[in-house]
């Protein structure tokens, strides 16, 4: 839906979908903002674009459905399906040279074009959510209305609060996060409607409602886990006149630091989506294809994100930097860092935060965080160390010769920024990643149901049958 389509209101009337009314008034960061009635809601915008998108996909499949889009090698089958072209993901496309594009927009373009909070420099993630779902850059009023709608939907059911409170503090924050999101299935409009029987054309409507409710509740869930495990258990209420990132920062206990709030806006934006093949995105899509609710689908994605090969990399970067400082002491010379890099590699270990399955250049998400740090914390010792490693590591990794991408990815920087502002509990960081990732995977889930995407069911083969497959491919 990346193209901009302007359809008449008849398209919306012809649908059986009844859009929720736009919030008529809301205070936003201290400014009273009133809907004029002219700003289309997110649901209205998506509903208007849907008929044309359905026709586009129908035409594409009719004209090119039998065309080959790629080949699969035996190595790819055994190697995690790397590079296999078999998924449709509308929100973002990852180019190996230039990095991620959200609906065709680079990160710098999103930083420039998406609405910001008054006095802020970073984009509001509400705007990115709108962009990922519709392909359009929203107006400031539309983003304010979306902020207000999420705030209005944010109240947690009492049993969810009690469920989190009963978790032992020793239970990993991601396990608690997944547990709470799974339990929200009790509130799923999609699950209840499906049980009663609904038209397939209406699937997206209930998926949309669940996704909006779920996203709205994530900051309070995430903050409650953080405050229970690491602080005094007290969580500030959602402020209805504030944006999504402010409320998350404030509920965590850092709302009085404007720079941390800005960091959350940047963090939630750049961690939201990274194509559809990564574990959390693909898992959410896969589970959703079985018509599981957004709650169950996202919870499955969060469980994938909790894996050390996916969502724990920024924590591992911090651990590695800390060990390096302890090992080389005050001698933070280029030569000492170079030697430590080599000792890491020679021990058969990877340098965390460097390399990527797809990227072959410095991750633009790393660059955006580096630019933030240069503005806000240029003299921080850990940032200086990260910068020093950035200068040295690519050369060492290239000389080592076992990586296709010797450049830093997003994880090489994010943990250092969070540490600087006092959020030092590294085993909590993946929860923040999960809040952000919801903003990327749930738009696609809505699109999947709107386009009638089928259940995912690739074909598998055993190792014993592989030789016969190779013989057939050579004929």
Curated annotation (Swiss-Prot):
Enzyme Commission no: 2.3.3.16
Pathway the protein acts in: Carbohydrate metabolism; tricarboxylic acid cycle; isocitrate from oxaloacetate: step 1/2
Record field: transmembrane: none
Protein name per Swiss-Prot or TrEMBL: Citrate synthase, mitochondrial
GO biological-process terms attached to the record: carbohydrate metabolic process; citrate metabolic process; tricarboxylic acid cycle
Family in the record: Belongs to the citrate synthase family.
Family matches, as Gene3D superfamilies: Citrate Synthase, domain 1 (1.10.580.10), Cytochrome P450-Terp, domain 2 (1.10.230.10)
The organism of origin for this protein: Aspergillus niger
Catalytic residue list: 310, 356, 411
Gene: cit-1
Taxonomy, superkingdom: Eukaryota
Any GO MF annotation of the entry: citrate (Si)-synthase activity
Keyword field: Mitochondrion, Transferase, Transit peptide, Tricarboxylic acid cycle
Additional observations: Citrate synthase is found in nearly all cells capable of oxidative metabolism.
SUPFAM superfamilies the UniProt entry points to: Citrate synthase
Places the protein is found: Mitochondrion matrix
